[in-house]
Amino acid sequence: MELSALTAVSPVDGRYGSKTIALRSIFSEFGLLKYRTIVEIRWLQKLAATAEIAEVPAFSAEANQFLDAIAANFNEADALRIKEIERTTNHDVKAVEYFLKEKVAAMPELHAVNEFIHFACTSEDINNTSHALMLKEARDTVILPEIRNVIDAIRKLAEEYRDIPLLSRTHGQPASPSTMGKEMANVAYRMERQYKQIANVEILAKINGAVGNYNAHLSAYPTVDWHKFSEEFITESLGVDWNPYTTQIEPHDYIAELFEAVARFNTILIDFDRDVWGYIALGHFKQRTIAGEIGSSTMPHKVNPIDFENSEGNLGLANAVFTHLAQKLPISRWQRDLTDSTVLRNLGVGVGYAIIAYTSTLKGISKLEVNRDALLAELDHNWEVLAEPIQTVMRRYGIEKPYEKLKELTRGKRVDGEAMRQFIDGLALPAEEKTRLKAMTPASYIGYAIELTDKL
């Protein structure tokens, strides 16, 4: 069977492949080979730009342009050639080195220094830097923009529904009212915090040899300040943050930090998906139907909240992958073992499930239509929620056992507006307070909900 959306083992590349297409050039085998090629080229250029390394003379503009073009124009044919070389070497990083030696053979200036490709590097020097570039691009060009889309959509709901009253539920039971907009604002605020934390994670990399001490570097060029050289290469040539203290491998703590931050965002989104699912079940939201769609194979009337359910399921898968990556990657025996290698090939899997989920949530949000009449009817059926403000005012004016009196009137009972007004009339309260309390309804008892939403 040829690999296609129909034959792919994983739905990330199969059924949902159209939603994850932006990740292919980043997290695929092609992506890894592309980043390895970029790192090797930038390393050679850095060596040539260092006067103390006389054996690699400063490159001409043409030579640098030649190398830059290899990096910028890396394509599937290049990746296939590397894989062809790997069939002989049985070593994926060495195959990239040999591929570049083939490429530079066309330019005598570069061919003369081809043994400085991969100079003093261990494979992990190339791999960890490639993963850093991979994760930086994924975070900055895919993950954060998609998260921003979700947050902005929820912010829009907050603005649109800022003044639509909602019966709150604590422990599933009627509680003091809010507004639908304020509940959306609560979610958006939580998500904004996680967005900032994801954006602020330092993407770390190292290039310091087989055990992190520049042993090979110093043996060849003992007068070069390799520690400084390494920092400049990581921060300037590659544009990521430098980790100066490592073993053979960059310890991957930052990957754990990044994915744990994304997982926290995902957990908040699961909470949102479930709440909206519940609001749909209660009739607080209606879902706009799409012509031709079928909700059930046997019940023609069904309009199911499938987008929020799909999102919740995929977020669970994403977080399961992220959790394993965060727990496993920072652990490596002594100066390194190879258990991280196969795990690192799955960086895109968790991200893929997350992107699928974000897309589904956005689709679900686009179908939502608030059912104002149902919300108001529910509030009008739960006048007992005004027991809280009444007993609180009673406390202010020193009325004995206010809580207990309201408990006797309302706990486990349905009371209407007239019953509440009669109770208020019987209280020893100033006339203006009685008037204010009797004018209050469940729909108007929303505190600062609107103001807080507007301040988001």
Curated annotation (Swiss-Prot):
Question: Which top EC class is given?
Answer: lyase
Q: Which GO terms describe its cellular component?
A: cytosol
GO BP annotations of the record are: 'de novo' AMP biosynthetic process; 'de novo' IMP biosynthetic process
| Phenotype of gene-disrupted mutants | A reduction in the expression of purB leads to a reduction in the efficiency of infection by a Vibrio phage.
Provide the catalytic activity annotation: N(6)-(1,2-dicarboxyethyl)-AMP = fumarate + AMP; (2S)-2-[5-amino-1-(5-phospho-beta-D-ribosyl)imidazole-4-carboxamido]succinate = 5-amino-1-(5-phospho-beta-D-ribosyl)imidazole-4-carboxamide + fumarate; (2S)-2-amino-2'-deoxyadenylo-succinate = dZMP + fumarate
Annotated binding of N(6)-(1,2-dicarboxyethyl)-AMP, by residue: 15-16, 90-92, 122-123, 248, 297, 302-304, 310, 336, 341-345
Q: Which domain of life is it from?
A: Bacteria
Active site residues per record: H171 (proton donor/acceptor), S296 (proton donor/acceptor)
Task: List cystine links.
Answer: none
* Lyase listed as a keyword: yes
Q: Which InterPro entries match?
A: Fumarase/histidase_N, Fumarate_lyase_CS, Fumarate_lyase_fam, Fumarate_lyase_N, L-Aspartase-like, Pur_lyase, PurB_bact, PurB_C
Enzyme Commission code: 4.3.2.2
Pathway assigned in UniProt: Purine metabolism; AMP biosynthesis via de novo pathway; AMP from IMP: step 2/2; Purine metabolism; IMP biosynthesis via de novo pathway; 5-amino-1-(5-phospho-D-ribosyl)imidazole-4-carboxamide from 5-amino-1-(5-phospho-D-ribosyl)imidazole-4-carboxylate: step 2/2; Purine metabolism
Q: Name one GO molecular function term.
A: N6-(1,2-dicarboxyethyl)AMP AMP-lyase (fumarate-forming) activity
| UniProt-listed CDD domains | PurB
Keywords associated with the record: Lyase, Purine biosynthesis
Q: How does it assemble?
A: Homotetramer.
Q: What does this protein do?
A: Catalyzes two reactions in de novo purine nucleotide biosynthesis. Catalyzes the breakdown of 5-aminoimidazole- (N-succinylocarboxamide) ribotide (SAICAR or 2-[5-amino-1-(5-phospho-beta-D-ribosyl)imidazole-4-carboxamido]succinate) to 5-aminoimidazole-4-carboxamide ribotide (AICAR or 5-amino-1-(5-phospho-beta-D-ribosyl)imidazole-4-carboxamide) and fumarate, and of adenylosuccinate (ADS or N(6)-(1,2-dicarboxyethyl)-AMP) to adenosine monophosphate (AMP) and fumarate. (Microbial infection) Catalyzes the conversion of 2-amino-2'-deoxyadenylo-succinate to dZMP and fumarate, when the bacterium is infected by a phage that produces the substrate of this reaction, a step in the synthesis of dZTP (2-amino-2'-deoxyadenosine 5'-triphosphate), which is a nucleotide then used by the phage as a DNA polymerase substrate.
The entry's family comment says:
Belongs to the lyase 1 family. Adenylosuccinate lyase subfamily.
Protein name as it appears in the record:
Adenylosuccinate lyase
